[in-house]
UniProtKB/Swiss-Prot annotation:
Predominant localisation class: nucleus
InterPro entries reported for this sequence: Ribosome_biogenesis_Nop16
Record key words, sorted: Nucleus, Ribonucleoprotein, Ribosome biogenesis, rRNA processing
Presence of keyword Nucleus: yes
Subunit structure comment from the entry: Component of the pre-66S ribosomal particle.
Residue ranges, compositional bias (Basic residues): 225-235
Naturally occurring in which organism (per UniProt): Coccidioides immitis (strain RS) (Valley fever fungus)
Recorded family membership: Belongs to the NOP16 family.
Region (Disordered) residue spans: 1-28, 120-189, 211-235
Pfam families: Nop16
Signal peptide: none
Protein name: Nucleolar protein 16
Domain of life assignment: Eukaryota
Single Gene Ontology BP annotation: ribosomal large subunit biogenesis
């Protein structure tokens, strides 16, 4: 026979208390992107994480992009490259575009290819009765924002005020770490290490297994670090 109170809880419609986990639905650890005060002050809640990092001059991924990501080309480089001119053996990067093909109505052979600039094309197409830019047919405002930000960051070398502030903060933290005094071993810790060495010598795994001399169950790596420091202080 089960417990009556537990059965009532199972039948109840009241929501059960769930312990907050430090992991996301995908199983990865949750990261507080606003943990840094400088980033929190310059964060735009209307943009996604990738767009915010791009705007601030930061990288969302440390690894190189893989699959489905095309290397961007700055607007200045595109203006200097002609689709009809080649410079030696260097391969020119040609951006994909559209053109009209004029065919013979009888044979179907291609007579000529009309480029958009030759046909007086203004770079727009008609979508659902509305004229849209050929590069942005869905009229997505974030697409325009991303293009502008990408070209700006590439031209300026991704150097922003936020990056400079973060670099100064990191340099100050590094100086504080250098000024910290190293931890000195106490007299009791030195006596404890001396007893371990007198009994086991260099056999650190045996020191770990000793319940009397190692009541706090210090790990093998921890004891090795303490011994290394202890031997260094004796010299």
């Amino acid at each position: 026979m089960g417990r009556v109170l537990q059965k009532k809880k199972n039948r109840s419609s009241a929501p059960k208390i769930k312990i907050k986990s430090g992991k996301s639905k995908s199983g990865k650890k949750k990261i507080n992107v606003l943990g840094n005060s400088i980033i929190a002050q310059n964060w735009d809640k209307k943009l996604t994480l990738a767009q915010n990092y791009r705007r601030l001059g930061l990288a969302t991924r440390l690894n190189a992009p893989t699959g489905g990501v095309e290397k961007g080309v700055s607007a200045g480089a595109l203006n200097n490259i002609s689709s009809l001119a080649t410079k030696g053996k260097t391969a020119a990067q040609i951006q994909p575009s559209e053109a009209r093909v004029e065919r013979d109505p009888e044979t179907g052979k291609i007579l000529r290819i009309i480029q958009p600039d030759q046909a007086g094309d203004d770079g727009t197409i008609e979508v659902a009765g509305h004229k849209r830019r050929r590069t942005n047919p869905l009229d997505d405002p974030l697409n325009e924002l991303s293009d502008v930000e990408d070209s700006t960051l590439r031209d300026t070398g991704a150097s922003t005020d936020v990056v400079s502030a973060l670099e100064r903060q990191a340099a100050a933290e590094e100086e504080r770490v250098k000024k910290r005094k190293p931890r000195h071993q106490s007299k009791r810790e030195e006596e404890w290490l001396q007893r371990l060495v007198d009994k086991y010598g260099d056999d650190v795994p045996a020191m770990v297994r000793d319940r009397k001399l190692n009541p706090m169950q210090q790990t093998e790596g921890d004891i090795r670090r303490r011994l290394r420091k202890w031997h260094g202080n004796k010299k």
